[in-house]
């Protein structure tokens, strides 16, 4: 009998040890999440290539770079722009404060907001000041342009570090030609780069809500609550709005009604803006992984560990996902499987998003350098001694580079 009791106690101890080990493994896995390999045989639309559904040429000439990430899908790939390095600086303009997000380009002007609340419109050809506004509120997002109006989010009064979660924020609507304020919408602190689709202006707020505001009535059509602050912009495709929250979730909602279609979880915060291509949602997470979810289902298709936080939003081109990591490496990942096609040691953490132009992928590091790599093989083609976050946008004549406190207009050498 005693022997049976001893065996029973030993079995119980083993079960407890196994349970503790299993729980410990789950905790370890959450803190050190690994790679989950995917396949292009599941929810992969090869024909959904970035840049295929291009805007009319006349519209592109007037508004060559209308929003953060170039298009509604935030692909960060601009078709038809064939500007290649080496570049010469045609002009440069000091902003007096940090440029955390890149400009947009429209109506032959470049529009950008600096961290201290200064918003400027520069002549694209010369860099001369067209108009400026002083908001006195922190700006940590790109504007968006639609039908003659520039929409810029505002945070709490400068400096940015003193923000409170319940502080007010705004999105202001400015006449793109004169800078006149047309109207503003109050929400919580707004850090997300907005998006206009049709008559609806979409943006998220630290008040935990995603907003859809009618640009004609200036009223909210719907709001969608999440479990934490929204700090990254939304993306749009096929009638669905995709966005992420600091509640560790990605959401897909009906763009007209705000009705939830699906939500999916990561193991830490999502700061990055989603990128949509090939029927998938690509997004980085502070757990150090890049995720691919199905646009229609929300199913996890792959997750790639990078060795450091992924604040960077992704660019997509030629069935490849381009993204930087705090591990100081820049990655080109197979969009189908998540496998590494190539990687590049950038020498410093990467926080901002890349851009692909004419087969070259551009990105900056926190070491204040900007690189241009051959997007096919990762070979370094160009380097510039400024830039910190999301550096490059373009039109048919210039590449515009957001440095730490300067904006540059670049021209191809000899062009």
Regions found by a protein language model. Give the residues of each.
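Alpha-helical transmembrane segments
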Residues: 17-22
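Repeat-blade elements of multi-bladed beta-propeller folds
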Residues: 25-30, 59-70, 96-118, 137-171, ...
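Glycine-rich phosphate/oxyanion-binding loops and their immediately adjacent helices
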Residues: 113, 125, 216, 244, ...
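Intrinsically disordered, low-structural-confidence terminal and linker regions
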Residues: 9, 23-24
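Aromatic (tryptophan-biased) beta-strands that constitute blades/sheets of beta-rich domains
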Residues: 24-101, 128-135, 170-175, 180-186, ...
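Short, glycine/acidic-enriched capping/hinge loops at junctions between secondary-structure elements
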Residues: 75-79, 116, 123
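N-terminal Sec-pathway targeting helices
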Residues: 1-16
């Amino acid at each position: 009998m005693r022997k049976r009791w001893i065996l029973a106690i030993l079995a119980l101890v083993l079960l407890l040890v196994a349970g503790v080990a299993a729980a410990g493994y789950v905790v370890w896995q959450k803190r050190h999440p690994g790679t989950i390999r995917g396949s292009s045989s599941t929810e992969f639309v090869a024909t959904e290539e970035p840049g295929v559904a291009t805007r009319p040429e006349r519209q592109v000439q007037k508004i060559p770079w209308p929003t953060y990430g170039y298009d509604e899908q935030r692909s960060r790939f601009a078709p038809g722009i064939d500007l290649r390095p080496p570049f010469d600086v045609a002009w440069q303009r000091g902003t007096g404060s940090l440029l955390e997000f890149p400009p947009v380009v429209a109506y032959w002007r470049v529009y950008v907001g600096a961290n201290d609340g200064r918003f400027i419109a520069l002549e694209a050809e010369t860099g001369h000041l067209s108009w400026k506004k002083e908001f006195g509120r922190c700006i940590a997002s790109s504007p968006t342009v639609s039908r003659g109006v520039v929409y810029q989010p505002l945070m709490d009064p400068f400096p940015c570090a003193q923000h409170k979660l319940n502080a007010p924020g705004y999105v202001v609507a400015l006449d793109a030609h004169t800078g006149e304020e047309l109207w503003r919408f109050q929400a919580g602190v707004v850090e997300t780069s907005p998006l206009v689709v049709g008559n609806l202006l979409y943006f998220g707020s630290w008040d935990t809500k995603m907003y859809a505001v009618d640009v004609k009535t200036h009223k909210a059509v719907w709001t969608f609550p999440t479990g934490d602050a929204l700090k990254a912009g939304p993306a749009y495709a096929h009638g669905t709005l995709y966005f992420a929250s600091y509640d560790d979730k990605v959401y897909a909602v009906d763009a007209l009604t705000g009705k939830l279609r699906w939500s999916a979880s990561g193991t830490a915060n999502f700061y990055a803006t989603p990128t949509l291509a090939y029927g998938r949602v690509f997004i980085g997470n502070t757990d150090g992984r890049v995720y691919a979810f199905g646009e229609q289902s929300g199913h996890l298709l792959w997750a790639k560990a990078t060795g450091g936080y992924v604040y960077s939003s992704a660019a997509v081109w030629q069935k490849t996902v381009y993204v930087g990591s705090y591990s100081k490496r820049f990655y080109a990942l197979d969009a189908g499987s998540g496998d590494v096609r190539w990687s590049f040691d950038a020498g410093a953490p990467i926080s901002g998003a890349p851009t692909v132009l004419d087969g070259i992928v551009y990105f900056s590091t926190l070491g204040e350098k900007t690189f241009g790599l051959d997007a096919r093989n990762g070979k370094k083609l160009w380097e510039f001694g400024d830039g910190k976050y999301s550096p490059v946008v373009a039109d048919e004549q210039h590449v515009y580079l957001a440095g730490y406190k300067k904006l540059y207009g670049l021209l191809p050498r000899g062009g």
